[in-house]
Amino acid sequence: MPIALVRHAGTLFGANRFRATGLRAAGLKTGGHLLASLAGAIGAMAPALAQAAATYVPMKPMPGKGQPVPGGYTFQDQYSPIGQEALRMHDYVLLPVITAIVLLVLILLIVVMARFNRRANPVPSRTSHNTVIEVVWTLAPVLILLAIVVPSIRLLAHQYQPAPKGALTVKVTGYQWYWGYTYPDNGGFEVISNMLEPAEAVRRGEQPQLGADNRMVVPAGVPIRLQTTGADVIHSFAVPSLWFKLDAVPGRINEKVLMINKPGVYYGQCSELCGARHGYMPIAVEAVPLPVFEAWVKSQGGTPASLPTPAV
């Protein structure tokens, strides 16, 4: 009898332990499903959360970035693919060619002055021609021009390529003496941009005559189809650090692609004499991450458009 009781107790204990293990396994399995469901829900909500978290706050300009600097003697740093290509051509093609020509001409002048003056050469040479020299000074300029022309044509072709599919359209209108930025792909709203008073520009950390009350806000890393026109006289939309310049002519739409590699504030000015206050038409282009741009569009009463993934 005691042996039977012990066996019965062991059986009950084993069954209860198995039941408890099964309950724990079921609990873990249920918890795993809950965690997986929660993770999936968070993953699905991530874009919406990111969009909700993205808010537009005017970016502070960085000293020396996208604007002129005191004592500057060369091009501004470039923040567009076209600008970087042009800067490479200037640094690695034009400057070496110019330096070589200047040094060659200088050396030849020194040699001629030293060897063929009246004291060193009292009897002048009566040589009428030199075939080798004539061939050299004919072929050398041709080769030099080819070395300059080929990359120049490629650079010009890249500057005027048509806008790719999905590019954001921004229409720039030049007025006397301010700018208007219209966003047709985002509902067609227009932003009017005037120069800040010098004291207000300094307070915001911007250079006088460059700061604007409203900037042209665009997404960084996304191709921009920039269209320009003039409402009254001819203006010119120019931003040196983006290697961008396009005339704004009344009654005509000019178009060019703009691509900005990095977020930041980039300054320019009207580059076509347009009247008494021509010198007071600053341009401030602010490139921001795509979610921030979409938040800015909503703050202007516009609708975000479907854009390609930024290349930044």
Predicted segment positions?
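N-terminal secretory/membrane targeting signals
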Residues: M1-A54
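Alpha-helical transmembrane segments and their helix-start/interface "positive-inside/aromatic belt" motifs
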Residues: G27-A39, D91-L95, E134-T138
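Non-transmembrane, membrane-proximal soluble domains of secreted or membrane proteins
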Residues: A52-V93, R115-V312
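Active-site-proximal cofactor/substrate-binding loop regions of enzyme domains
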Residues: I98
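Alpha-helical transmembrane segments
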Residues: V102-F116
